[in-house]
Amino acid sequence: MILCESKYAISYQQEMKKIFPASESDSLWKAAEEAFQKLLEENPDQPQAVAKHTQISIFPAIAVYQTIAAKYPDQAMQVLENGAGTVSKKAGESYARLLKFPGIKLIFLKVFSKGVKKGFGPDAGFAHEFITNSDKTLEFHVTKCPYQHFCEKYDCPEIVHIFCKNDEYAYGNLPHIRFIRTQTLGTGGNCCDFKFMR
């Protein structure tokens, strides 16, 4: 896989072009690509469910952030926050459009819970506990997160909050669905407490 296959990385690159001259942006991007490949080489043979997160989201963020931070520490966080925010807000807009279709709000939480169990379960490096799982309320706590794990492993725990914020952008403004969260692992909490109410 190459860095530009990640939608997050492409968004980071667009943010870089806004901040840096073209030649410097290109140079940073090339260095980030090399850093990304190194991360892949250091973490071979990951299960597909884990790789879906590391290759698309986690490793691109680490590679871009550390590359920029080495020369421009004040701009590195800005690139990640703005770039990830753009992608996550688009995801939120897609969910919002979906929920406007007749009947979708009635089944959304049940379908969403299946997606959580499959894409954010033990096979993907997460641990979670479901508290409530009905058609009107979905509540679960994440107690282990690969985003936190890999950011800590590569000495950049300060970027974990960006992934947490992505959830707020994606789920925080949905019609008919209220998203509540009071803490995250990435911001010092005991868990990531997700609660959706219809």
Regions found by a protein language model. Name each.
Residues 1-68:
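N-terminal, charged low-complexity regulatory/assembly segments
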Residues 3, 51, 74, 154, ...:
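Charge-dense, low-complexity intrinsically disordered segments
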Residues 56, 60-62, 66-154:
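Amphipathic interaction/junction segments at domain boundaries or subunit interfaces
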Residues 16, 68, 120, 167-170, ...:
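Hydrophobic, Leu/Ile/Phe/Ala-enriched alpha-helical segments that form helix-helix packing faces
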Residues 28, 126-130, 179:
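Generic structural motif
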Residues 136-198:
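C-terminal non-catalytic interaction appendages of large macromolecular assemblies
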